[in-house]
């Protein structure tokens, strides 16, 4: 099937202009349905459930074939809603943030929402607050913050992914750090590991203290001692002006080398995240160690790229 393109007409003076946009009324007339029915379906309104599935399929197919584009400005003015959400991330290209963003995008688009993204690049708290205010001025209906700590409650409904704030009106979405720590350490101990090195998270990360507490409590419950000489805290300090995704891998590599240079024997590493685990793995291999034969490596998050590492 040939790709659809917008029709272009020529005016009397030879200039090109776009053909008139297809309206919701045009779609309704094409299907011999009422505009109200078509509107319910295309806007996925609650009343759409009462419309037969085959009719809904016809509406979506016709909207596609006619290249219908909803007028979001008119829609917003009528409903006094923007159908948009603001998303704040530390760094868009960071593997963890990128995966979370992909999920956010898919769900919002399915629900008929658009989104605006801002990256504060782990800069100052002031910049983060400025971005929240900027997004509010863009009339977004809510905020989603990914691994971003805030100190004041936004005026809009907000969800923080990997957040631990107790601010009123803010919902936190976090993984079960306690269960993750127990499962990881139990598995390593079943493999025979007792001297397990640990990468504690960067001081500026929202998950650092929760994951560290979970590891210590899990270790105590399993009768495992976390050795101070095998514990390193990632600095989170950027190589340049701001922290970048590459810095996370580099830091994991650097701290992996530090572990080897200390000379204290260890047979496994429990890293704060997959990015630092991947960096450390490269350091171990470059240092002549086999992974996992000599050193087992595991990290929090389970990002997609970790499944494609060799070894994995």
Predicted feature residues:
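Short acidic capping loops at alpha-helix termini that bridge into adjacent secondary structure
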Residues: 195, 226-230, 290-297
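Periplasmic-binding protein-like
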Residues: 131-132, 139-146, 197-200, 242-244, ...
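N-terminal helix-turn-helix DNA-binding module of bacterial transcription factors
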Residues: 1-80
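Flexible loop/turn connectors
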Residues: 5-6, 253-312
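Alpha-helical recognition/docking segments in bacterial nutrient-uptake
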Residues: 1-9, 14-19, 23, 80-186, ...
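Hydrophobic alpha-helical segments within soluble ligand-binding/sensing domains
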Residues: 171-198, 213, 217, 248-260, ...
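Short beta-strand elements in bilobed, periplasmic/extracellular small-molecule ligand-binding domains
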Residues: 108-119, 216-249
């Amino acid at each position: 099937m040939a790709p659809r393109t917008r029709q272009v007409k020529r005016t009397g003076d030879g200039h090109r202009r776009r053909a008139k946009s297809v309206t919701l009324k045009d779609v309704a007339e094409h299907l011999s349905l009422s505009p109200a029915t078509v509107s319910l379906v295309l806007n996925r309104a609650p009343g759409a459930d009462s419309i037969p599935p085959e009719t809904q399929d016809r509406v979506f197919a016709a909207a596609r074939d006619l290249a219908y584009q909803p007028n979001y400005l008119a829609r917003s003015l009528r409903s006094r809603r923007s159908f948009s959400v603001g998303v704040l991330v530390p760094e868009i290209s960071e593997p963890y943030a990128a995966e979370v963003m992909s999920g956010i995008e898919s769900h919002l688009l399915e629900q008929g929402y658009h989104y605006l993204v801002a990256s504060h690049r782990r800069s100052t708290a002031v910049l983060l607050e400025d971005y929240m205010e900027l997004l509010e001025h863009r009339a977004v209906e809510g905020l989603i913050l990914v691994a971003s700590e805030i100190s004041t409650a936004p005026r809009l409904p907000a969800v923080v992914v990997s957040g631990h704030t107790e601010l009123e009106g803010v919902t936190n979405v976090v993984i079960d750090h306690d269960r993750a720590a127990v499962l990881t350490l139990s598995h390593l101990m079943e493999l025979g590991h007792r001297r397990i090195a640990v990468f504690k998270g960067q001081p500026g990360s929202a998950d650092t203290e929760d994951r560290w507490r979970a590891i210590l409590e899990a270790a105590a419950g399993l009768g495992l001692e976390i050795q101070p000489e095998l514990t390193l805290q990632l600095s989170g300090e950027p190589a340049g002006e701001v922290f970048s995704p590459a810095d996370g891998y580099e830091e994991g590599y650097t701290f992996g080398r530090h572990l080897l240079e200390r000379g204290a024997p260890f047979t496994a590493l429990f890293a704060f995240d997959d990015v630092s685990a991947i960096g450390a793995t490269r350091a171990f291999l470059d240092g002549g160690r086999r992974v996992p034969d000599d050193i087992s490596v595991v990290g929090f998050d389970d990002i997609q790229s970790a499944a494609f590492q060799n070894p994995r």
